[in-house]
Amino acid sequence: MELWPGAWTALLLLLLLLLSTLWFCSSSAKYFFKMAFYNGWILFLAILAIPVCAVRGRNVENMKILRLLLLHAKYLYGIRVEVRGAHHFPPTQPYVVVSNHQSSLDLLGMMEVLPDRCVPIAKRELLWAGSAGLACWLAGIIFIDRKRTGDAISVMSEVAQTLLTQDVRVWVFPEGTRNHNGSMLPFKRGAFHLAVQAQVPIIPIVMSSYQDFYSKKERRFTSPGRCQVRVLPPVSTEGLTPDDVPALADSVRHSMLTIFREISTDGLGGGDCLKKPGGAGEARL
């Protein structure tokens, strides 16, 4: 049975009306629409990036192209990203960046502050994420199979050599997975072993909580939003050995968690979602 021509128009208008009603009446629907568009937009930008990046082949300099394409994404959602402490980045030497990991929105803060010749270490599954995976591979992103410990250790040893010989910086999320509970998970020690093995400094970066505008658990994504990205002073690993790694990881996590609580309660990213006795003040760096 064929529909008369006007029926398709009527169905389209009905669908648009339904979507509009869901958008204005359901915060959960708005959350899913926004996240679907966010992920779809990233895949589309990756398609644009692939032919440009392919000219160089797999090259860390291609991260500049991805960053340029992704920097505007915060404006689509009315998210203001404020960066503090960027002067703490060493101007020339290699280093390991460690950052907290809350959601895929971390990409917005990362692109805002990403240093030159810095690539993330990502789970291997991302490599198969369509156009995004290919764009990431062309940008030199390092993929690790977290299920195969032996392979991961081998890759990290190679990365340590790359840091020193090719003047590359790496960005690691030491929690190992996204954390939505308004705190920080215990840190895995791979990034710290890497920094100690290469004898390069660690640069902790903290992104404030998104709870005032985003919550996966509550299916909430509102606009506008504000996020502060705080770059902490370098942590030296000079002279440290693998035996020092557990204490090093705990110390860095403690300093990052302290800053996370401060900047998530000062009205620049977390509203009052994280209460801290005595109030919040400017972090002393």
UniProtKB/Swiss-Prot annotation:
Its EC number is 2.3.1.51. Residues 29-34, 146-189 are lumenal. A motif (EGTR motif) lies at residues 175-178. Widely expressed. The keyword Nucleus does not apply. It is a multi-pass membrane protein. It comes from the Eukaryota. Pathway: Phospholipid metabolism; CDP-diacylglycerol biosynthesis; CDP-diacylglycerol from sn-glycerol 3-phosphate: step 2/3. It is found in: Endoplasmic reticulum membrane. This is 1-acyl-sn-glycerol-3-phosphate acyltransferase alpha.
